[in-house]
From Swiss-Prot:
Biased composition (Basic and acidic residues): 42-70
Matching Gene3D superfamilies: P-loop containing nucleotide triphosphate hydrolases
Protein name: Protein SMG9
Highest classification ranks of the organism: Eukaryota, Metazoa, Ecdysozoa, Arthropoda, Hexapoda
Stated role: Involved in nonsense-mediated decay (NMD) of mRNAs containing premature stop codons. Probable component of kinase complex containing nonC and recruited to stalled ribosomes.
Length: 487
């Protein structure tokens, strides 16, 4: 009786031991993600491992097709995704379009070496990335071809690069002669296709009105007189009315419309510079010339096209131009052309009927060529037999209708825009240096910083050497003569 029991007990013990050595597979997950061990691939191992790569890639593709054909619900959402061995280049020799920003744990961005690919390439180092990119990776990688966030983030990136569009002029010189450095954000950093147009003239000569004609392109049937020329003009970019300044409760005093240098950028990226009047009324006589010289020297240094508004022949304006050309400061900017001079256009505003006659226009051109020719300014347009003085006549109008001596106002504005915008744009930088709007703004800031102190220093030296010495010499001679007469 004991022997059968002993044999049964020994048999049961032997079966338990054999069960530990040979486990039985009960179930297997067919839809589980296939894990691959990461490994480092060198360039010399590429040929040897090519067949292995192809087989594994075919298996992965077949497995993905099977999953798409027969999807099965997963009971394990925390299962990590499959890892693939990716090839990146050890060196920095990669195209700019393939550069990628990789996010770190702290939220910082680090420039990647190149575009990640599942196909082995001729690079040296290998890196590991997830086969299923997350939303964070899509938003952070801007150079990968497979990311979905690239197309969505491209318009936002372009909008950030574009400067805000202007709807009114902005002053460049604020109170106390301080340069407005905050205007830098209104200029494009990389745009090189722009034109700088400045205007100079006396008080109430029509400088702001001319810039209003260049600020926007309008149709021929546009009511220019009602919106831009009349006293009730309501669509002027640059102010054309006098400002009222109260005088201790008494009657108001008319102030100039433009009191400081200001600019406006059009949709076509034309930078329009409006200036205060030359030789303004009410300024101190000692600083009147210095104020005008600083503004004129600044525009001669930073403009492509300069409009000189003339009302007859102003010899004071010619004297200031000669002084500004000879005494303007040297700008030490990289690539800037020394002694740069813009293309000059003479505009006769409020011209009368007699000014449109052929003999009168030829006489005016000869006078301007004789006076402004020695300055060296480019005042001509055309070449060969078509070379003539660059002048334009704008009549004094009271409506949009045409008269016996000029066309309608819409046609005159069209001709004026073609004349100004069609002028030769003289470059202010060498050919090897591309002048962008941001670089031009730095040149403008440098000229504004040097112009006013430069002319004040010259005036102080002239006054010390000539004016003060002459007064002292006269007083000394008078005293000497009076003492000799008494003796």
């Amino acid at each position: 009786m004991a022997d059968p029991r002993r044999r049964f007990r020994n048999k049961k013990r032997d079966e338990a031991c054999s069960g530990l050595l040979a486990p039985v597979t009960i179930a297997r997950r067919e839809d589980a993600a296939r894990m691959m061990q990461p490994k480092i691939l060198l360039k010399k191992d590429r040929d040897r491992e090519q067949e292995t790569w192809d087989r594994e890639r075919d298996k992965d593709r077949k497995l993905e097709r099977d999953r798409e054909a027969e999807p099965s619900p997963s009971c394990y959402p925390d299962t990590p995704p499959a890892l693939k061995t990716m090839i990146v280049n050890r060196t920095g020799e990669v195209r700019p379009a393939d550069r990628c920003q990789m996010p770190l744990a702290g939220g910082a961005l680090v420039q990647g070496s190149g575009q990640l690919s599942a196909v082995p390439s001729s690079s040296v180092c290998a890196a590991l990335v997830s086969s299923v990119p997350t939303s964070r990776d899509k938003g952070s990688c801007s150079g990968g071809a497979g990311t979905a966030g690239t197309s969505a983030g491209a318009p936002n990136a372009l909008q950030e690069l574009q400067p805000p569009r202007m709807n009114r002029p902005t002053p460049l010189i604020v109170a106390n002669g301080i340069f407005n450095a905050n205007a830098r954000k209104l200029f494009h950093k990389t745009n090189t296709d722009f034109t700088v147009i400045g205007v100079l003239g006396g008080q109430s000569s029509g400088k702001s009105t001319l810039l209003n004609l260049l600020a926007a392109e309008r149709s021929l049937d546009y009511d220019y007189y009602q919106h831009l020329f009349s006293p009730e003009a309501d669509e002027c970019i640059f102010a054309t009315r006098h400002k009222l300044k109260p005088n201790n409760g008494q009657k108001s005093i008319l102030r100039p419309r433009t009191e400081t240098l200001q600019f406006f950028i059009t949709r076509e990226r034309h930078i329009l510079l409006d200036t205060p009047p030359l030789m303004p009324v009410g300024k101190d006589s000692d600083h009147q010339d210095l104020y005008s010289l600083g503004t004129m020297a600044q525009l001669l240094s930073v403009c492509h096209i300069l409009i000189l508004v003339i009302d007859g022949l102003a010899l004071e304006q010619l004297r200031l131009i000669n002084a500004a050309l000879r005494l303007r400061p040297t700008l030490h900017c990289k690539g800037y052309v020394r002694d740069h001079m813009p293309q000059v256009v003479f505009v006769r505003a409020r011209a009368h009927r007699i000014d449109f006659e052929i003999q009168q226009r030829e006489r005016l051109d000869k006078k301007l060529a004789y006076l402004y020719g020695p300055t060296g300014l480019p005042i001509y347009r055309g070449r060969g037999d078509a070379r003539c003085l660059n002048t334009f006549l704008l009549p004094e109008v009271s409506s949009n209708k045409a008269t016996a001596f000029h066309s309608c106002l819409g046609e005159l504005v069209r001709q004026f825009r073609e004349r100004i915008l069609g002028c030769t744009r003289i470059s202010m930088c060498h050919t090897s240096t591309e002048l962008s709007e941001a670089i031009w703004f730095e040149i403008l800031a440098e000229s504004a910083r040097k112009a006013a102190p430069h002319f004040e220093k010259i005036y102080a030296e002239i006054k010390l050497r000539h004016l003060d010495t002459r007064c002292q010499w006269r007083s000394d001679n008078w005293r000497t003569f009076s003492s000799n007469a008494e003796s």
